[in-house]
Amino acid sequence: MSRKRNQSSCEGDVKSKLAAYRERKEQSPVFVSNCVATAWFDTEIDIKKLVWTCYGELDPTTFAAAKFRVGKSKARALVFSSGKIVCTGATSIADLFLSVQQLQILVNKIHPKVQCLNICVQNIVSSAYVGGTIDLLELYACLMKRGICDASYSPELFPGLRFSAKSLNAELPNVKVLAFSIGNVVITGGKTMSEIQQTWDFIKNTLSQFITENRIEHRTILKKLKQDRETGT
């Protein structure tokens, strides 16, 4: 339960930041809401003893891993008896690696010589605000015309439009994008911050073309020009 509350807190922090940009109708930078990494200890772990010593949570009838809050950060860790660990909830790569180091300190209390190996970032989840509300129907129609077949939009089932960044530009990372009509955008699947930033730098320009306010203004200008031509003014 505490891990869920923590993740909700991280998401809440990002949502409040996006809400501030949305109120000003101002495009935001990209904010990280969750980083996930896996790693291995170089020995099997007595997770029952670890939970007893370090005040973790373990219920083997429902889940095979012990759960720990790591240090003072918002990160959480799962420790399996095989030695595998999963860290989640960090809001930066630096915090993620710090969480793994802090977890090793806990494990060293019962396994003094254990070392953490093969730390690998598996997923970075981030969000941003494009600067206005998005016409998802127009965006979806445009993606279909461009032959982007992996785009998915079924508003009766889910309010977001999904597509892969790589389908827009082959040079982009293999990450997934989720756009909502209020203007919020979620980028997931990145392994580095440069992948996230590269994706946002590209797609924000594409999505900006479908901001409702911009399209209304554009249509108004075209209508005015047409009227001027017809009246000869």
Model regions and ranges:
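Intrinsically disordered, low-complexity polar/charged tails and linkers
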Residues: 1-184, 190-233
